[in-house]
Amino acid sequence: GQPHEGQPAPQEGEEAEVVEIPEYFTAKRKSVVTYPADLFEKHTWHDGSPMSVADFVMYLILSLDPGTEGSEIYDASQVGKVESFKSSFKGFNITSTDPLVIEYYSDVWYLDAEYNVTDWWPYYDYGEGPWHMMALGVLAETDEELAFSGDKSEALKVEWLSYISGPSLEILRENLDQALEEDYIPYAATLGKFISAEEAADRYNNLLNWYRIQGHFFVNSGPFYLNKVFPVEKTLTLTRYQDYQDPSGKWDLFGTPMIADLEVDGPGRVKSGEEAVFDAYVTFEDAP
């Protein structure tokens, strides 16, 4: 269903709050994004997990839940951000999963057309995030072991969550063990419609193997993955992701600036008041 005014997804074992929804909403902007039909076949996270609809839904949930009172990961420092978002947010609807089609309704619009497209790609403030990676952070913050924000970490006197280094890693590893043992599906009342127990187990095992090899939990899906982290030296290494779906030469077309050549042909002189015709020829590298 479509969320109404950012109602938080019920936690497992809780009854969903009944909210009276108006017969219809109005919105100043409707964005429809259709993803490639083979998105979930070819696009994988760096730990080998295929991307799924659940990654997008988790992103929507975490756009609202931290700043919503009553949430198990409620963060007072996020209230302003969430309330600002909710003031213009009118709806989110997945009309198809094959291919993935996402409708988004909002009262915020822009003069530049490209900014009016909202894709809901799971990209957080610190980069992309698959649902199973984010789930470890949710578990840790729910138990007040770590906090997603610096403000909350100071308020709770706990470590500011880091997926790449520091004391967070041991805590995240413990939560990964818990997730594996319990077949944990975060926000199960909602995400349980998109995640099976088998998929959850596969994802967590992929993340465990990733951690054993890479030594961190930061999983993305771009052309380079975070290989090694050296926090003392403040350096890191990135390595090409061999299974990235786009060929390396996909954007070669834009390697050379397409500066056109213009030639105008017409009479050299024109008498005032008379009609004149000029032909304009626009070429790039001698081609029209």
Describe each model-derived feature in a short phrase.
Residues G1-P288:
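The feature preferentially marks the first beta-strand/turn patch immediately downstream
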